[in-house]
Design a protein with these regions (language model features):
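Short loop->beta transition adjacent to catalytic acidic/histidine clusters or analogous donor-positioning motifs
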Residues: 2-4, 25-36, 44, 56-60
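N-proximal low-complexity "stem/linker" segments adjacent to membrane-targeting elements
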Residues: 1-25
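Glycine-rich, basic loop-to-helix element that forms the pyrophosphate-binding segment
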Residues: 64-81
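A conserved acidic beta->alpha catalytic loop
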Residues: 38-47, 66
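Conserved donor NDP-sugar-binding/catalytic core segment of glycosyltransferases
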Residues: 98-134
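Acidic helix N-cap motif at the loop->helix transition within catalytic regions
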Residues: 18, 43-52, 94, 98
Length: 232
């Protein structure tokens, strides 16, 4: 059983997906699986993923019958995961090559953590890179996390699910709080915010890390703007 599953919900990202997959297959920690979710785009994204899958058995491709949107595409990917922990990677972003190694290092120290939030790097279209420096190495109970992060740090977009490691069973359990009608609705914004709070409520311990492991890349098709991510 792999330790970590990296989920890539994929829709019309042929310009970027090779970079994202390369950042997964070249992780310094090798005991992972990479799940590419085909959300029925019209470009060659999945063809590119299939070429990588031919060369690396850790890559699994699953196909949605129709376009479900980000929330459901991620959910379908997690249902197919075989690991104890999952991480989301939007295919127009990419990971530091030691991202999974850092996850495992923290898990070995904070064995009861259900959720780990890492700082990340914002890469602008111009090439300018801003490194986040708003998190410290800390572990919280759910009550401490709500008080110290959600209430006191209102300038931080804490509800984005990128740059986070989540225990698989907690993510799946969080969907039991959603009405079936919501789950079957194709949302076009705030998908992360919808499920984030249910995830947090299911956690026992939450860890934050000052390590930058995730490159959030600005592009013309980015679904979230700079100010929605974090004030850097």
């Amino acid at each position: 059983m792999p330790k970590i599953s990296i989920i890539l919900p994929t829709f019309n990202v042929e310009k970027y997906i090779a970079r994202a997959i390369e950042s997964c297959i070249n992780q310094t920690f090798k005991d992972i699986e990479i799940i590419v979710v085909d959300d029925c785009g019209s470009d060659k994204s999945i063809d590119i993923a299939k070429e990588y899958a031919k060369k690396d058995e850790r890559i699994k491709i699953i196909h949605n019958e129709k376009n479900l949107g980000l929330l459901r595409a991620r959910y379908e990917g997690v249902k197919a995961a075989n690991s104890l922990y999952i991480m989301f990677l939007d295919p127009d972003d990419y990971l530091e090559l030691n991202a999974c190694e850092e996850c495992v290092r923290i898990l070995n120290t904070e064995k009861e953590s259900d959720f780990i939030w890492f700082d990340f790097i914002y890469k602008r279209i111009s090439g300018v890179i801003n490194r986040g420096n708003f998190l410290q190495d800390q572990t919280f109970t759910i009550f401490e996390y709500c008080e110290n992060i959600i209430i006191q740090n209102k300038n931080i977009c804490y509800w984005n699910l990128c740059s986070k490691l989540i225990k698989t069973e907690i993510y799946l359990a969080s969907f039991s709080f959603l009405e079936k009608e919501i789950l079957n609705t194709r949302l076009i914004m705030a998908e992360d915010a919808l499920i984030y709070f249910f995830i947090i409520l299911n956690c026992g311990k939450i860890t934050t890390s000052a390590k930058n492991i995730y490159y959030y890349c600005e592009n013309d098709n980015s679904s979230v703007g700079t100010n929605d991510i974090v004030k850097i």
